[in-house]
């Protein structure tokens, strides 16, 4: 065989390799497009199909890390068995779970989600703001900075003021909001959704007449007296 002759097997291999390179390039392009579409869909997702959570602003830097906002209102208890993982759950779902701890709503996740969804509609109608933003501001305002613990000295129990950890501050704020909702709607003509909206708006405006803010002020007042 002369040097000018080419091996047909080599030509076939080169041709096949070229086809493989094209296939790989096409697959990578399709994968990149799929990833981009998924990211875009995630960015455009809205809570309850209505409320944008991508531009929520925080005023309290100490609790910002523990007030998570996502467009997902139900994660199927994914973090239930992991300590401190609750801070990765959306604050809206945590509020829903808190409301479920009352007697009538225990275990009724869909019912409680409907209450929160209706409350958000009411908040938007009254304030013309994003209700998720109003909730975040309400949680920040209702989170106590000080509370008391009881220490025993020689058999005597003495109250002592302590600073509240940021994660517990958020826990307490959600508890106050849920308790205020239950108190406002129990044996009352006011619905749970209206009661919840009223408590959240009051907390967001730092209204001392609001149950959540009142409980926060009471906790800090008792702690100040125990210093």
UniProtKB/Swiss-Prot annotation:
GO biological process, one term: translation
UniProt entry tagged with the keyword Lipid biosynthesis: no
SUPFAM superfamilies xrefs: Ribosomal protein S7
InterPro entries: Ribosomal_uS7 (IPR000235), Ribosomal_uS7_arc (IPR026018), Ribosomal_uS7_dom (IPR023798), Ribosomal_uS7_dom_sf (IPR036823), Ribosomal_uS7_euk/arc (IPR005716)
Gene Ontology CC terms, in alphabetical order: small ribosomal subunit
Compositional bias annotation for Acidic residues: 1-12, 20-31
Claim: rRNA-binding is one of the keywords in the record: yes
Region (Disordered): 1-43
Biased composition (Low complexity): 32-43
Keyword terms, alphabetized: Ribonucleoprotein, Ribosomal protein, RNA-binding, rRNA-binding
Coiled coil spans: none
GO MF entry, a single one: structural constituent of ribosome
Summary of subunit composition and partner proteins: Part of the 30S ribosomal subunit.
NCBIfam families in UniProt: PRK04027.1, uS7_euk_arch
Membership in a protein family: Belongs to the universal ribosomal protein uS7 family.
PANTHER family: RIBOSOMAL PROTEIN S7
Function summary: One of the primary rRNA binding proteins, it binds directly to 16S rRNA where it nucleates assembly of the head domain of the 30S subunit. Is located at the subunit interface close to the decoding center.
The protein's name: Small ribosomal subunit protein uS7
Organism this protein belongs to: Haloquadratum walsbyi (strain DSM 16790 / HBSQ001)
